[in-house]
Amino acid sequence: MAGSAPRRRAFALLLAGLAFAPATAAFAQDVTVKRNVTVREAPRRSSGAVTYPVAGDRLTILDNGAKSHGYYHVRLADGRTGWVYYTYVTKPAQLATAAASQPGDVAVAHFIDMDQGNATLLEFPCGAVLIDAGGRDTVAGDHLLAYLHAFFARRTDLNNRIAAIFVTHTHIDHNRALMRVAEAFTVGGYIDNGVPNGSGRNPAKAMKDYVAAHSIPTIAGGVDSKMIDEAGTSGLSGPVIDPVACPRVDPDIRVLSGRYDDKLPGWSDEDLDNGNNQSLVIRVAYGKAKFLFTGDMEEPAIESLVTRYQNSDLLDVDVWEVGHHGSQNGVTPSLLAAMSPEMAVISMGNSTTHALWSAYAYGHPRRAAVTLIAQAVRRERSPTDVPVADGAKRFSTFTLTKAVYGTGWNGDIDVKALPDGTLTVTSSR
């Protein structure tokens, strides 16, 4: 299928009675590098590097513009040739149309009410990505499946395909429904932190086997700190992590943190063994609208994250999915200062479900955390009273005047983003 377009073009030329020169002379179009990328010796991620163009560099596409495994064959300014993945470059026509976005150029972050758990569907004009697929029980999983079926019934153009599934860490409230999703829909790629143990180890093992059996693209061994180190302060990306390439406004997806195999300065043994600190941190940009997902990352890892990116703007975002369901250890002043978010969304259960593993039992979200978030969030909202936890199984009322939302308060929450950075919020209750 991948080679059908070039064959059709060649056939059309023959019908017209035209002779054509070698591919490198028949077609030439300059493209601009959108973000730092590796030009490779062959059209595959495992091949050697030729060079490392930076954003703004221009390359010339060869081979009639055909792609091989998602890679363009390109010529560099110094005459060398290599292969670059198509999501890292922009054609002039794309630049022209991106400047004036169309009515359909909208992204939506669907924060799905999973009770005490997490699942966020990112909807783009040309694809969809899922971050986590966990909930407190099978009822939450039923809701996720129903939500996704309704979504794809509306977005028939996506053909029941999730371009990538990310699981931030191996806890059951983040991957309980993972296999149900994988078996119900087509999965284009799978990314996790590679940690085999934790309360979500059974879904993690089942998904690992499923990925291998179905040849689903993945990051072998999971995203780890060595990969993040090699990416520098740009974050880790590539065709598996960022598989969505829309023609007018192209989303940018990066992983900013992954698994730690060794302690960082200031970490205790307990910090390293804590699965929450191994959470993937995912940054998504759609035009000027930027989102950050920190999983269940706690204070030691958060401080390491802030330190790593202190000289970049990658943590400066508009929407934050609050870490660790609004637990006090998932929110820090330094992270809030680095983000300066316009709004925040907490994925947590409601305070009226008095059961094991519930928001009520854990005491989520904590008053201290909500207070810090409300002080940092820039957008205001009409005053509304919500229940917050003063401790496990102890709740009282908090009056929100800032744009802080929670699935336990508001149900399913949609944050719609336009390329110019305009954000609107709707919820199911």
How would you label these PLM feature ranges?
Residues M1-L14:
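Bacterial N-terminal signal peptides that target proteins for export
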Residues Y86-Q94:
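Structured surface patches comprising rigid loops and adjacent beta-strands/short helices at the edges
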Residues A12-P22:
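Bacterial N-terminal signal peptides
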Residues A28-R45, A55, D105, A109-F111:
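Short N-terminal segments immediately surrounding and downstream of signal-peptide cleavage
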Residues Q94, A98-A107, M114-D115, A150, ...:
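Flexible, acidic/histidine-containing loops and adjacent segments that form or flank the divalent-metal
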Residues A49-T87:
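SH3/SH3-like beta-barrel superfamily modules
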Residues F111-T120, P125-L158, F166-E183, L256-Y360, ...:
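Active-site-proximal loop/helix segments of hydrolase catalytic cores
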Residues P22-A28:
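Sec/Tat signal peptide C-region and signal peptidase I cleavage site
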